[in-house]
Amino acid sequence: ERHIAFLRNYDPTIRRLKKYFFFQNKFEKLLRKLKIDLVYFTGPSQYSLYLEDTDFIITIPDVSHRENLEFPEWTKSSEFQRRDEIISKSSVKAIAVITNAEIIKDKISSFYSVEKERIYVINHRPSLGISNFKNFSEDLSIEIKKKYNLPKKYIFYPAMYLPHKNHKYLIDVIKILNTDLKLEMSAVFCGSDKGYLEKIKKYSEKSGQINNIIFLDFVDDEHLPYLYLNSVALTMPTFSGPTNIPPWEAFMLEVPVLYSDIHNIREVYRDAVFYIDPFEPSTMAKGLVEILTNNSKKNELLNNGKKILQSVDEKKEFNQFYEILKKRRKIKNTWEFNN
């Protein structure tokens, strides 16, 4: 459905014909009616292609579809063309592009020929459910354990069920820990399904680990902190990145993080995570054993995670929004009249 909507509107000739016959497309007509002259898109959106007379800012969190062409969710069924057309056409026209790391800023500039001066870096922050978490409730923790049937020891992975998220890898890790190393360990997954979950479940059955895996959908914001806090670690063998929200949430809640060593990720998380090879499950199994048996290493990761959080000046970063607006207003004042 979204691809059809994209095809209907991305072509500039089609948009000009629509504008000629209907004066403006419905979206831009609504913006004019509401007297809105600047739009902020929180992610790549086909609606940015509708705008011909309205300024906009857009967030581009990653360009993974350019780096990992082997994953179907990024390249098959014309998804690559859809993503790339949206980003290529919107990034060069946006008055500002926002992303989450200097590495991604460089890639956006390189892939899409966007001036670096127009790309602003604003780091990820924990979700509101984590940021607003203050006091641990033992009663609520027990209630959540019962509600989700949480095992005694488990690794936690909050991620959509998609191939690039690498859930298959974690099932292999659990098998190594339980079968080869004789450690009792489970995994708790939570996230929305895009049609891939059934394959993951079948693989866990084939591997003999179905009883050691808990599959959840999205969970309530109030419950999310407890899924982190009751876990052994946040495990992220993902092939996307380098910026994702869960590591920041784990840093805030002081939960160890194991993360894929990909895409210059060390520039972002430095010494705050245990780096693993996303192709080799034994590297994560080794990391989990070290976290379980070496308190010094675990505390080092937790302390470094807190340092990364503290190093981000949230107020200074969000002030970049105001700088974008001030720059736009300053330029517009050179040609715009108030009468």
Where are these regions (language model features)?
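Carbohydrate transferase catalytic cores enriched for Leloir-type hexosyltransferases
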Residues: 1-339
